[in-house]
A protein has these predicted regions:
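N-terminal amphipathic/basic leader segments beginning at the initiator methionine
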Residues: 1-24
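Glycine-rich phosphate-binding loops that contact phosphosugars or nucleotide phosphates
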Residues: 29, 33, 38-184, 188, ...
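ATP/pyrophosphate-binding catalytic subdomain of soluble kinases
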Residues: 179, 187-231
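Glycine-rich phosphate/diphosphate-binding loops and the adjacent beta-loop-alpha structural elements
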Residues: 6-13, 44-50, 200-214, 220, ...
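Active-site rim loops that border cofactor/substrate pockets in soluble metabolic enzymes
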Residues: 220-251
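Hydrophobic, well-ordered secondary-structure elements that form the walls
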Residues: 310
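Flexible, glycine/charged-enriched surface loops at secondary-structure junctions
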Residues: 14, 172-176, 232-233, 319-326
């Protein structure tokens, strides 16, 4: 994408995606410090939210915590299902940009009425119902998003949870300037027109790879930005039965694929189904590859940015309004004060 080209610059979505580079560079990792003692006191952390406020921020935090291997237990679930859980021994973070997502507010009402004393909010607005019920709330600095599809807020939410993980591990959160440059490059790099044509004409776009939240978030963004059907195939799910109903008019995007499984994927999907397979990766793969820089411990942010770039190109090629989906709403399910 190119903000100096009118076919991109007319969309707030493109502007907000590109703003993430400065947001990353200027992020203050100390913002999570004041929450750490309460989390450690509980000994467990539960991250809830709906849609984009949970998928990448929460799941990436869990992935990183498991990679480190020595942190307290961290879990995530949507707020409605979380009503069925005993969260009394967890510090609970509820993420909602509006601060008035119905499911989050309802969960916090229940927990607060039961005497829960470790409820925390993560929002983009002050003076919200969520903030009024939380013991403490961090308000994002990214500013209001004009496009329906959340982008820069997703990145800042993830950075905030990332800072929680670093604090809990007693590690410094370094390298954000380099990450900013890598994300910027991923957002601006040219994508081969042949790839975009294949994706533009695909009946379904599948995303396959690690359960870090990045790929699942791209699956959601495919619906909002391109209006195309999509599905997230976690891990090696792509090799375990779904090939039975796949079609040659569909495309799979592998994000940083497991090298050990590439030959089997080629056998099952390319040769067996006859479908197109594309990869987004920091290395050359067995498939047509959108090459990105290796982001190290922050690599999932670079993957997400590259995926955004692809989705914008598809949307522009389809000639649709990237900012305003027909049915999707900025606040999916709003809490109404009675």
């Amino acid at each position: 994408m190119d903000k100096n080209n009118k076919k991109y610059s007319k969309y707030a979505l493109v502007e907000e995606m590109l703003e993430t580079t400065e947001l990353i560079k200027n992020f203050d990792p100390s913002v999570a410090g004041r929450f750490i003692s309460a989390i450690r006191e509980k000994g467990r952390l539960f991250l809830t939210g709906e849609g984009s406020s949970r998928l990448f921020p929460a799941k990436r935090a869990i992935y990183e915590a498991l990679r480190k291997g020595n942190l307290l237990p961290i879990s995530t679930e949507g707020a409605t299902q979380a009503l069925e859980y005993d969260l009394s021994n967890y510090a609970v973070f509820g993420a909602s940009n509006s601060g008035k997502t119905k499911e989050i507010v309802r969960l916090f009402e229940k927990l607060k009425s039961s005497g829960h004393n470790a409820l925390f909010g993560l929002t983009a607005n002050s003076g919200t119902p969520l903030e009024s019920m939380a013991r403490d709330t961090h308000v994002l600095n990214c500013g209001k998003e004009k496009a329906v599809a959340a982008t820069k807020s997703v990145i800042e939410q993830a950075l905030f949870y990332d800072s929680l993980i670093h604090h809990l591990a007693d590690e410094k959160m370094e390298g954000l300037s380099k990450l900013s440059e890598q994300v910027d490059k991923a957002l601006r790099q040219n994508i081969e027109s042949g790839m975009i044509e294949q994706l533009k004409n695909a009946d379904i776009i599948y995303f396959a790879g690690r359960n870090t939240g990045a790929i699942e978030e791209l699956t959601l963004k495919t619906n909002e930005i391109t209006r195309k059907k999509s599905d997230f195939l976690e891990g090696t799910y792509v090799l375990h039965g779904i090939e039975e109903i796949m079609d040659k008019n569909e495309v799979v995007i592998l994000v940083e694929p497991f090298e050990s499984e590439e030959e089997k994927i080629k056998e099952c999907l390319v040769k067996g189904v006859g479908m197109k397979v594309i990869s987004i990766s920091s290395r050359e793969t067995s498939f047509p590859t959108i090459k990105i820089q290796d982001g190290g411990k922050y690599h999932n942010y670079v993957e997400l940015a590259a995926g955004w770039n692809v989705l914008v190109e598809i949307g522009v090629a389809l000639g649709i309004d990237l900012d305003k989906p027909v049915r999707a709403r900025k606040v999916g399910n709003e809490y109404i004060v009675k």
